[in-house]
Swiss-Prot record:
InterPro entries: Haem_peroxidase, Haem_peroxidase_sf, Peroxidase_pln, Peroxidases_AS, Peroxidases_heam-ligand_BS, Secretory_peroxidase. This is Peroxidase 58. Its cofactor is heme b; Ca(2+). Ca(2+) 1 binds at D66, V69, G71, D73, S75. Gene3D superfamilies: 1.10.520.10, Peroxidase, domain 2. The active site is at H65 (proton acceptor). Belongs to the peroxidase family. Classical plant (class III) peroxidase subfamily. The record marks R61 as: Transition state stabilizer. Residues 1-23 form the signal peptide. The gene is PER58. Keywords: Calcium, Disulfide bond, Glycoprotein, Heme, Hydrogen peroxide, Iron, Metal-binding, Oxidoreductase, Peroxidase, Secreted, Signal. Binds 1 heme b (iron(II)-protoporphyrin IX) group per subunit. It holds the Pfam family peroxidase. It comes from the Eukaryota.
């Protein structure tokens, strides 16, 4: 498959706009207007994660699903409000019933509004919360840049089109990333976030029990013993909302075991395993490098997170600073 795609000319104005806007983001954006923003967010995430070991992965996923749909503008947090032109990305089938962690973002926003009202955007709260969550799980320091503003709409159909799916081919995955000026290294590094968290059985049901439309058949790329483990966790005809660990080796730690699992054909989601199973693809060597060297994975993940966090941002007078992350002002 052709993985190094030429970016269509129609996308260049969007990408150029993103580059120009990124220059307005800084690591110390709130140093005078809300200097305790990170400390406040960290305290609330630490407290919430003591009661929910999965929280850090949930928050990381929120940030990813925000940035991949029309940029990092906090739109994923908006509840559906048709009168305000908000369809709600939460209702996209990739998100419905599985996207979580909204409550801790609400708590952070409430706390910040009490000390520095109208200053910190919900989009930035997501970026800060993702940074903290990765660190709490043992991952690298991200040093996120700040200064985003919040969008005023959310479009369900855009979320359906933009977000990766479990059965996506490598070509489709690469295309979905390249739209955001994210390359193959970004694809593999960011996929490494599946080193923690869970997946609903509905996402992998066909891979385990109905692969390529063949009833009773499974994806032949799954290591046989691991297949039986997954089938016990997600039996045919079972609860599709039940969950399986994305990284069965160290499910709640941010490390490079995800890539080692791929090498052993123990990737849980088809679009994860395909990074290693696609013979001759440049993703294979990246999986091998990250499996061998955790520091190299951490370095590339941090770089890719900053890059993703700058996708089609709103700055200056664009958008707004929401008072409530769930609704527009």
């Amino acid at each position: 498959m052709g993985l190094s795609k030429t970016i269509p000319l129609v996308l260049l104005p969007i990408l150029m706009f993103g580059v120009l806007s990124n220059a307005q983001l800084t690591s110390d954006f709130y140093s005078t207007t809300c200097p305790n923003v990170t400390a406040i967010a960290r305290g609330l995430i630490e407290r919430a994660s003591r009661n929910d070991v999965r929280l850090t992965a949930k928050v990381m996923r929120l940030h990813f699903h925000d940035c991949f749909v029309n940029g990092c503008d906090g739109s994923v947090l908006l509840d559906a409000a048709p009168a305000d032109g908000v369809e709600g990305e939460k209702e996209a089938f990739q998100n419905a019933g599985s996207l979580d962690g909204f409550e801790v973002i609400d708590d952070i926003k409430t706390a910040l509004e009490n000390v520095c009202p109208g200053v910190v955007s919900c989009a930035d709260i997501l970026a800060i919360a993702a940074e903290i969550s990765v660190a709490l799980a043992g991952g690298p320091s991200l040093d996120v840049l700040l200064g985003r503003r919040d969008g005023r709409t959310a479009i369900r159909a855009d979320a359906v089109a933009a977000l990766p799916l479990g059965p996506d081919s490598l070509e489709i995955l690469t295309s979905k990333f390249s739209v955001h000026n994210l390359d193959t290294t970004d694809l593999v590094a960011l996929s490494g976030a599946h080193t923690f968290g869970r997946v609903q059985c509905g996402v992998i049901n066909n891979r385990l029990h109905n692969f390529s439309g063949n009833s009773g058949q499974s994806d032949p790329s799954i290591e046989p013993e691991f297949l039986q483990t997954l089938r016990r966790q997600c039996p045919q005809g079972g609860d599709l909302t039940a969950r399986a660990n994305l990284d069965p080796t160290s499910p709640d730690s941010f490390d490079n075991d995800y890539f080692k699992n791929l090498q052993n054909n123990r990737g849980v989601i088809e679009s994860d395993q395909i990074l290693f199973s696609s013979t001759g693809a440049p993703t294979v060597s990246l999986v091998n490098r990250f499996a061998e060297n955790q520091n190299e994975f951490f370095t590339n993940f941090a770089r890719s997170m900053i890059k993703m966090g700058n996708v089609r941002i709103l700055t200056g007078r664009e958008g707004e600073i929401r008072r409530d992350c769930r609704r527009v002002n």
